[in-house]
Design a protein with these regions (language model features):
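N-terminal post-signal-peptidase region of extra-cytosolic proteins
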Residues: 54-80, 89-97, 129-136, 164, ...
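Sec-dependent bacterial lipoprotein signal peptides
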Residues: 1-21
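Bacterial Sec signal peptide processing site at the extreme N-terminus
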Residues: 15-42
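Exported/periplasmic cell-wall-interacting domains
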Residues: 101-102, 106, 125-231
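Mid-length scaffold segments of soluble, non-membrane domains
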Residues: 78-79, 83-143
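Acidic/polar residues at beta-strand termini and the immediately following turn/coil
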Residues: 27-29, 75, 153
Length: 231
């Protein structure tokens, strides 16, 4: 997994000089960081690309919380995921939040990562949505889609995941099943910047408005991914 050199800082400084305080910059999704398999599978999607509402597209935003650079912060209330950058900035991604995602909050770490992971429906999903196959191979037809980042706490799997989606039209919404869904493009982008051991702060319900709260949520500790590079 390659990390890329910061270049947006130069652009950001220019914008500050020309237009005053910059607070929110749209960061268009690109194929930067895609591998050969990504390009092949993403060119043959079994669903139509969705028109994601502008607030839920990838942005670089001001961030005044105290989590360390390299930390992932999930604000389920407002359907945003933040990847904290240096100098009071963060990448903000729109997400869809499933019932499983509402059932857990706290501090976790990325314990496992997988490209185009298989999907193994949980007992709850089988009960709500079944009958479902016991195992679905990886690919764009799979609800996990492009990437899976599996969260662990105390060395144990929380069963909480950050992953892609084959239903991008639901980004920005609460949905009936799943954990934290991102567009496949955004899931690939985040995957290329985190690593096993990256700290993930999942805000408790009604503890949202993440970028504007100065406190460290839930006793968050500095991320192990403290050296952060960007495009």
């Amino acid at each position: 997994m390659s990390l890329r050199v910061i270049s947006f800082v130069v652009v950001g400084l220019a914008a500050l000089t020309l237009g005053g305080c910059m607070t929110d910059t749209l960061e268009p999704a690109t194929q930067a960081g895609w591998n050969t398999r990504d390009k092949l599978l993403m060119s043959n999607l079994p669903y139509q690309q969705a028109d994601i509402p502008e607030p839920y597209r990838r942005h670089i935003v001001d961030y005044t919380r105290k989590e360390a650079p390299g930390t992932v912060v999930i604000d389920s209330d407002n359907k945003f995921l933040y990847y904290v950058l240096p100098n009071g900035r963060a990448v903000r991604y729109g997400i869809a939040v499933g019932e499983e995602a509402q059932a857990w909050n706290g501090i976790a770490k990325v314990g496992r990562m997988e490209e185009w992971p298989p999907w193994i429906p949980t007992a709850g999903e089988q009960q709500r949505l079944g009958p479902l196959p016991a195992y679905v191979t990886g690919g764009p037809h799979n609800p996990m889609s492009s990437r899976g980042m599996y969260l662990y706490s105390g060395g144990k799997d929380t069963l909480y995941r950050i992953h892609g989606t084959n239903q991008p039209e639901y980004i920005g919404q609460a949905i009936s099943s799943g954990c934290i869904r991102m567009t496949n493009e955004d899931a690939i982008d985040l995957y290329n910047h985190v690593k096993v051991g990256t700290i993930v702060v999942v805000l408790a319900p009604k503890n949202g408005d993440a970028p504007n709260s100065p406190k460290v949520a839930l006793g968050s500790v500095p991320s192990e991914a403290a050296t952060v590079k960007w495009y």
